[in-house]
Amino acid sequence: MLESYFPIFVVISIAIILAVVLLSIGKIIGPKRNNPEKLTPYESGMDPVGSTRTRVTVRFYLVAMIFIVFDIEVIFMYPWAVSFRELSGFYGLIPMVTFVLILLAGYYYILKKKALDWDEE
């Protein structure tokens, strides 16, 4: 029974060995000297202005999580839209309508809780 897992073991072993070898080569061959110019933060080719250690408000993370949820929605809707003709008519529409209604309920909840309001309280 374990013989059937041997190819998987070989592939994982090769991947680990290759990763270690490539990281080691990069460490050996790569540049080792740091200077102040290399240690400055990069801001799109501009000279850094102000401190780079400022705090980011939680609202940015909330917007990022909402974006991920709706991005995943699009990922699920694309295969459904491509194969819609092969689905059995109305019965192919019901699961997607249910899925979209659940997501719209979540979006309504977000708006109701005023999670996207950026006004100071």
Curated annotation (Swiss-Prot):
Keywords: Cell inner membrane, Cell membrane, Membrane, NAD, Quinone, Translocase, Transmembrane, Transmembrane helix, Transport. The chain crosses the membrane at residues 6-26, 62-82, 90-110. It is a multi-pass membrane protein. It catalyses: a quinone + NADH + 5 H(+)(in) = a quinol + NAD(+) + 4 H(+)(out). InterPro entries: NAD(P)H_OxRDtase_bac/plastid (IPR023043), NADH_UbQ/plastoQ_OxRdtase_su3 (IPR000440), NDAH_ubi_oxred_su3_sf (IPR038430). One of its GO terms (cellular component) is NADH dehydrogenase complex. It comes from the Bacteria. This is NADH-quinone oxidoreductase subunit A 1. The lineage of its organism: Bacteria, Pseudomonadati, Chlorobiota, Chlorobiia, Chlorobiales.
